[in-house]
Amino acid sequence: GRAAKQKIPVSFDEKLTNEAPQAWAGQIEQLVFKGSAYIEEVVFFHKDSQTLILTDLIENFETESFPNPLRSKVYKLVRVAAPDGQTPIDYRMTFIGHQKEAKECLERMLAWQPEKIILAHGSCFLENGRAELRRALRWIR
């Protein structure tokens, strides 16, 4: 992967699956989001705070603060600009032909009833998490 190419040492204790490891089982649910031909993102849900934690599945950048107006326009074009942040177009394209798997994963995440969504890229959604999840992943049919 990227870490190896950049000679960054990375070690793993175990592979993440749909079952939470003993260390956080009962507190945090997790799901391997399937459907992409190239990427499997593990999503997490912290039960007590009703918080969904995502890495790349949704990006939501505040483009008004970007110093370069062209960059701001590009982010809007690829649908990762707030307040309508979604799955980046390049990532979304990897789901072509596998929407059924993605839909099943989305349904499981919606069943968790998240109130908040923490994102690795951009502004988080601190309320109405379930509605924001539906909105951002509306491309999954």
Predicted regions mapped to residue ranges:
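Cap/insert and terminal regions of metallo-dependent hydrolase folds
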Residues: 64-141
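Short active-site-adjacent helix-start/loop capping segments
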Residues: 6-9, 126-127
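Catalytic core of the metallo-beta-lactamase
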Residues: 8-77, 104-105
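Short internal beta-strands
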Residues: 1-4
